Every structure is written in C-alpha cells, then in structure tokens.
Amino acid sequence: MNPALESKVKQAREKLDAHVREIVEWHFNPATGCPFWLNKQKEWNLDVRKEVQKFDDLKKLPHFEDDWLRGGPVRRWLPKGLEGRPMYVFETGGSTGVPKSRLQIDDFRTDYENFSQTLSDKTFPKGSDWLMLGPSGPRRLRLAIEHLAQHRGGIAFSVDLDPRWVIKCLKRGEMGEANLYKQHCVDQALTILRANPNIKCMFTTPKLLEALAEKINLAHYGITGIFCGGTELTPQFHRFAREELAPGIDFVPTYGNTLMGLATHKPFDPSDNYEIIYHAPQPRAAVEIVSPNDAEEKVPYGQIGRVMLTTLTKETFIPRFLERDQAIRRPPCEPYPWDGAGNVQPFQGLGVSVVEGVY
C-alpha cells in the first residue's frame, strides 16, 4: 500500500471510530435511544457508552440476531430523540420467511443523495427522468430511486412488481407462471419507455435487465445509464451486461439491502477481470469479511468469507449482523480507503434454500 493510500486508510478509520462513539452515545442514552437498545443494555448489564469507544469495541456486543427484526412492535426501534417525526417502515424481500422491518425517516434519502455523488452527470444527466424496473410495495428501494431521481432533477416512473409472488411461484415449481409475471413487468417497462422520451436512466435487477434487453435496444430508447442491483451480479453477468445487454451504456452495479443502504462499486478496471468490488458507505455502514467458522476473525485478503454488516445511523443501529452473503475480502482503494467485498454471492453455509426470484 502506498503512503498516500495508507494515510487515507488511517483517516477513514479515525472517522469511523468517531462516528461509532456518536452513534453509540445516541442509541444507548436514555434521553435519545430506542426502547430496544435501552432494554438490551440492561439485559447485558453493560454500560455500552463507556465500553464502546471505537469500531473494534463493537466486539464487546453480541452479534445482531436476524429474528430481532422479524415481527414485534416496530416502534421499539424508534429512538426517543426522533419521536414525532414522520416515519416509514420498510421490509426486506421476504425470501427467507417473515420479512425483516426497518423504521426510517431520512436514512434512505441521505444514502441515495450520497450515492448520487458517485454518478456521472454525462451518463446519468441531471434533469433526466428514470425508469424504476424493480420491486415495489413495502420496500425502501422504490422510494429511494424516486428520491434519487428527484434529487437529480428528474421524475421516476415505476412498474408494479411484487417479488414475493415470483418466489411463491418458484417454490411451487410454477416456472411458466413466474416467467409470465416477469414478462408482465417487462411489458410495463416497455409501455413507460415508449411514452416518456425523457427517460435516460434506469434501475433494474440483472434478470429483468436481461429480459428487457431481449425485447429492445436500450440505447435506441435513449438510455445512457443503468444502475443495477441484485444477487446475480457475477463477473460473467457483469461482462455480459457491458458487452451484450447494454454496450455503450454506463453500467453501475451496486450491492445493498434494506438494512445496510447501498454499497458503491470500485470504478471499473479491466484488470479486475469483471469482478465487482463493493465498498460500504462508511461511516454510515461498515462491512467486514469474516471466517465462516469464526465470525470474530477476518479472512485474509483474497479469501472468501461471510459478509458481516454494521449499520451506524441515528435512525438504525445494527452491530455485527451476519448476512446471508459471502464475498472475497478485497483491500482498500483510492476512492474508498477501507476494505471491499468482491464477487458477492449467497452464503453457501446456511443450509437453507434461498429463492431469489426476480433478483
């Protein structure tokens, strides 16, 4: 690592440590914290504000449990310091049982305004409209893309898409029904594109991008930038998208979910062999790649491990959550001087079948 990057890494770590202190102070202070974390602090018999002074101190807390967000009174997650504000409740996809829920006020706006700074104004031109070809319903993504479009001076046009119906079809083995529903969503997108020539940008998933590109030449319809997220963003698909599905169009892959927000990708470099390397939006969220057998230990660079997420905002504190994804641990880079996650895929060690549907 060169000295300039090493200095950036150190500064980023100091910023993360300071942010951890601020967020822990907020969530575990009786005047501002939420009932859930204040009760947990009593249960642990731990003065969290005293014990957690930097990011590494979060190891003193147990891993965040998946089931904590599944059901239960959702207001237990509302910090007292934010009471009285208009709220949203967003759900995860529900591909592994009861959906997880997250209360939000402004986090989705902040996350996507920050993400907007990484987009090219040439290929995602300000003032242009967007097509949202992705999940609707109780997911944060639809409102987030809408806000991203508005933040950049445009309007977002959305299809009506229920991924849970697709998952039900696939679990029942009804592939034909699932494909009909996918075509129904693509038909909606085609109708929107034909009626709105100011659409230059779009969000979609790998499977839906492929289905749409089979029907039309996206560049001929004026699309100049594609923001793509989902579980099928392999190096093979990445190359296929750039060379076959959307040649000449700026292809921007992301990794994200309702709990984290979204991670941006390291700028495209042919030497990466089309591997997509993501970097979390520190200090608001941090990702570590840990050993599948010992989550207290990071794997060496270049090795595959399980993704461990920590979310650090005033609206949401999620420490050391073991995601259902695996990735290759990658080193810091100039734009993002902290660890990256390469070639993210569903984690192989869960022992449960995960149906991804339209993603």
Question: What does each of the following model-derived ranges do?
Answer:
Residues 33, 45, 93-97, 142, ...:
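Glycine-centered flexibility sites
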Residues 39, 147, 239:
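Surface-exposed charge patches
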Residues 1-91, 97-129, 134-138, 151, ...:
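Nucleotide 5′-phosphate-binding alpha/beta core
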Residues 142-156:
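Conserved short alpha-helical elements in the N-terminal third of ANL/AMP-binding
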Residues 1-26, 152-359:
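Active-site glycine/GP-rich loop and adjacent strand/helix microenvironment
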Residues 101-105, 141-144, 169-170:
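Short, conserved acidic/polar surface loops in the N-terminal third of protein domains
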